Amino acid sequence: MSEAKAILEIHDLTVKLSNGVTALEGINIDVKQKDLIALIGPNGAGKSTLLKVILGLIKPTGGTVTLFGSKDLNKNLKYVGYVPQSAQARDPNLPFSVYETVLLGRTPVAGLLHGMGAKDRQKVDETLKMFGIYELKDRKIGQLSGGQSQRVFLAKAMVAEPKLLLLDEPTSGVDTSSKKDFYNILDKLNKEREITVILSSHDIGVITKIANRVLCLNRSQFFCGENEDFQADIEIHKLYEHPVELMEHHDHP
């Protein structure tokens, strides 16, 4: 049985910011189809920067990024879904309804010039129902709870049927029950729909339970490998520079 082909290849990646600060250095990872990768590290570790490099929003200073076989990232971004940090997603001043927000997610498929057709609107309806938010379709984004908002932005990312899903601390500020539901949805998308996922989060115990691989960053790369080889207490101690013990609590560590 042949080994799964990498859909994202990052080799010797370095990113220096305009102020001269090195945000990332020496990052190497090959992401294969159906991977669910836990991206962990303290604030300022470069997790968001790495995701923005993959999205083509930040240009690397050195190294290469190959997405679905091409170093021209814009060529294949239509296959990538993105869920931003919850603080960005839950702007109370956003004037859009739930339906309009998810419909915008079809842009990579439908394009801006041709407009949305019946097929696009049907896909939006199906996606809203899949994530259990169809009854919220006319509500404004600013009127939603944290958990509802994150389902909407996950639906927006998924409505274009991506092959790779990037999530940047999607559950910060969200209640425990909503977090559990959100991670269960991600787990199903990965296992049942074979969506490749890179998930940045501080919920280390939870995401390392559902992930098959782990990438630890603090500007440089501390660990990258299989979940079964990840020694949480040791690696997290290195990352955060103080002892950490993961405890079991309810359904989550």
Locate the predicted segments by residue.
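Conserved ABC transporter NBD signature motif
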Residues: 63-76
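Conserved ABC ATPase "signature" region
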Residues: 103, 118-136
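Conserved catalytic motifs of ABC-family nucleotide-binding domains
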Residues: 161
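Conserved ABC ATPase signature
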Residues: 140-144, 148
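Catalytic Walker B motif of ABC-type/P-loop ATPase nucleotide-binding domains
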Residues: 165-168
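H-loop/switch region of ABC-family ATPase nucleotide-binding domains
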Residues: 201-202
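Helix-to-loop junction immediately C-terminal to a conserved catalytic motif
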Residues: 55
